Amino acid sequence: MTKSRDPVSKLHDAAVLWAVGYGSALDVVRAACDALVAGADGPSVAMLAGVSVRQADTELRNLLPAALDELGSPLYAENSEEAEVAALKVLASRALAGDLSSRELTDWAHRTFGHDRLPLAEPLAALDDQYDMLGYGPVGPSTAAVAALDTEVLTEARRILESAGSDRGGKD
């Protein structure tokens, strides 16, 4: 289901998800390796790609800003609202691509932002509540009910990607 994405976009996404604690430093280093192999050459990208597995957590903060700057990709402060919005857009994009289920997107948004921390994510938290409600009762949820809710989530994911202030935000 995934359409091929360029390695620089994948590095951006890995950096965004790391900035909100959803991805690991190693994910970023691996994405830098892929970008380097694909021709995104530069001394900072090469240094980031060369970080050892054991040193990824300690070296990333020092090397990532220059590497992203070389690639013309934005750097987000860890746990900033800008990073959270960008991460939400990355995961919304993955849901639309079929790489993340609608339920996984709503669950992450609800656990991460609740109902009032990030207004852009609130509709996903509400949809997560609806998924939870489908699970109650003596009979499991109907396939049609789940499919309808999945469709609502994907509509919301599109709205998130089209929202004002969209940087690259996970779009191809």
Please state what every model-predicted region is.
Residues 1-172:
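Acidic, Ser/Pro/Thr-rich low-complexity regulatory regions
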